[in-house]
Amino acid sequence: MIELAPDQLPPLARWFAAGAPGPAALAEHVPASGTGSWWADRAHAPRALAVACAGQVLLRGDPSALAPDALAVFDAHYVQAPTCFLPALRSAFDRIVPWERMLYVHQLPVAAPCPPRGVTVRRLVPGDAPALAALAPDAAWLHASWGGPAGLAASGLGWAAFQEDEVLAVACTYFRGSAYEDIACHTDPAHRRRRLALACVTALCQDIAGRGHTPSWTCSRDNRPSRLLAWVAGFRLVHEYVHYLTGQPARCGAVPGSPAAHPAAAVRPGDTKASPGGTPRWRGRDSVR
């Protein structure tokens, strides 16, 4: 596939439904935020279209229009696509691993828990970028959809629990759509089980509702802590789906110019890739315990 410039994009309404919850909001988030990239089988009158951001990909169109290795640019990504794309994915990579996912929508208002003494929950501001950057490296996925710590801090769409200048927990809009905002949260492992994530998520949900939008939440079926937090925060299950973690290109080696070559795709907001032994581990948007 070839990468499209913003002025080369076809009308998106026929490709992606507007106002959809969960990862479908990615297609609206990319043009609004300026992060991510668009790909097609050809620039003029494309038959297959992909949008990628922060290690996630949405595929639409006619897979028969793709060359056998056309999707190899999306190695080490989480791909959501109609089942008709599975043969094309299998031919492009040495393996694809299905992940069962659960999509929740916020339905019940929840009272915010009182933060512990010395902890303040507030909206992120541009000056908080250094504090976000100081989070552990395995939390870098949190701001990938905003192009980095500065992008998330300046977006005005994140809430964090602070102890002095240290970020203990963060909840933020990950993909912002026209009706739904798919959210993510992370708590420093040393500060889990203090209800900090719940405090941040509750504040974020109130903020999103104030914009006239609805929060959504996605996580792995196997991640009970994430599912429990979603339930306690007032989210309810509305849909289950599968996305696919891609392996290495079938022809081996990273594809030059692929999204995986960029820092934003270095960590992925899903369950994480399979470990070297082949056993998947939790990580990314599920690291909310």
Walk through the language-model features, giving the residues of each.
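A conserved beta-strand-loop-helix scaffold within acyl/acetyltransferase catalytic domains
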Residues: 147-188
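Conserved GNAT acetyl-CoA-binding A-motif
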Residues: 74-83, 208-220
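Acyl-donor-binding surface of acyltransferase catalytic domains
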Residues: 24, 33-128, 244-245
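Short amphipathic alpha-helix that is part of the acyltransferase structural core
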Residues: 1-23, 109-146, 257, 271
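Conserved glycine-rich acetyl-CoA-binding loop
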Residues: 180, 185-199, 222
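Conserved active-site alpha-helix within GNAT-family acetyltransferase domains
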Residues: 86-96, 198, 221-239
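Conserved acetyl-CoA-binding loop-helix of GNAT-fold acetyltransferases
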Residues: 65-69, 193-207, 228, 232
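Active-site rim helix/loop that mediates acceptor-substrate recognition in acyltransferases
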Residues: 21-34, 138-162
